């Protein structure tokens, strides 16, 4: 389904792209793909919008994912939400360069929304930005990512396809057709005190940027124990797999 605004300009063709989705096995592959998309948009005069709702606000080690593309590949617009306040209060923002949102393009009272002046959202955003700077959370995201990569490179579980991360956000891809599934791993981890999100063939792991080293080490230890033990389990409450379904 799609919606076309009755006042939409038929000559305006924007492209919104989540630059770093952690779907490839390497960070560099996603960066190069995003650069290629951005350059195609520039070549054909297509508005390029960077979707930073989930992966923006420092998670990858830079404040914006688009920062990884280099200054010559900046997007025309950026949309942010969710992570911009550290999850403390709902807020969303649209950023744009002068060619798209400058004073010659948008006049007073041409934009607005019901909650655009929500004081709580504004304060939550400003406070989160202050904490990012004071606690050097961009560097912390990089440190978390490096530590995660160092720990997981020695994991040799036969059902793991590959492990990859972008700063403090990570994915563990599971080979299809196994008794071991992302959902079974996630449910067993949940019982042991660690929440990870099963999504398709992968486990998505998002580390809080203010996590302590002790909390990180404890969580990674639990995750490793789950991966070591999961093949020996039959039924895992909350998980659904043919291996758990009793024969009729």
Label the predicted regions.
Residues 1-2, 6-9, 14-248:
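Conserved N-terminal phosphate-binding loop of PLP-dependent enzymes in the Aspartate aminotransferase
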